């Protein structure tokens, strides 16, 4: 019966040692992942079915910037072959402006349209997305809840709105949009933003 009696606190000490060993191993693995030797493990090659893999098959397409955080990998891709204008009228005959695409984890494209002149975004007036702006003469302010696509931004610019604010959930993508368009962009959850404003 003596073997059943255990030393008080022995179980707690064993659990503490096990937790300390696991924590130490986790820290060592984490630091190792930051070394140049582990770069192959950190960099992933996207699946052939991802948008990033598909557009990289176009000539003169290049990934110009890549960043990674807890929300995923964000790539900015430039190509002379990228065009995005869903719902474009068949009557539109002018060439579309060049675009840059921002991809999260190789998918979820957000297209950023060239904006060297106001005329370059006027193509948006010939899209179905612009129909709402036809109902209002010139909107005072526009809030764009942007999760993908990106056509909403040139539509708002083409409408001549006085104030345009863009909201995107991913801070990395929000920074790229802000830098590209020079418009106010907020990173965050749309519901939280709307309840606070």
Regions found by a protein language model. Give the residues of each.
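Conserved SAM/SAH-binding loop
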Residues: 187-197
């Amino acid at each position: 019966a003596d073997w059943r009696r255990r030393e008080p606190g022995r179980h707690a000490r064993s659990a503490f040692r096990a937790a300390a060993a696991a924590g130490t191993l986790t820290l060592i693995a984490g630091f190792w992942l930051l070394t140049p030797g582990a770069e192959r493990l950190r960099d992933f090659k996207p699946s052939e079915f991802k948008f990033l893999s598909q557009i990289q098959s176009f000539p003169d397409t290049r990934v110009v910037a890549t960043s990674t955080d807890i929300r995923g990998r964000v790539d900015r891709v430039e190509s002379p072959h990228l065009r995005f204008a869903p719902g474009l009228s068949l009557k539109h005959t002018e060439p579309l402006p060049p675009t840059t695409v921002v991809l999260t984890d190789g998918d979820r494209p957000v297209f950023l349209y060239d904006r060297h002149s106001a005329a370059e975004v006027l193509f948006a007036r010939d899209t179905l997305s612009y129909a709402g702006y036809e109902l209002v003469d010139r909107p005072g302010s526009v809030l764009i809840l942007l999760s993908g696509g990106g056509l909403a931004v040139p539509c708002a610019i083409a409408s001549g709105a006085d104030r345009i604010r863009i909201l995107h959930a991913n801070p990395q993508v929000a920074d790229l949009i802000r830098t590209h368009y020079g418009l106010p962009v907020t990173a965050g959850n749309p519901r939280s933003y709307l309840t606070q404003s």
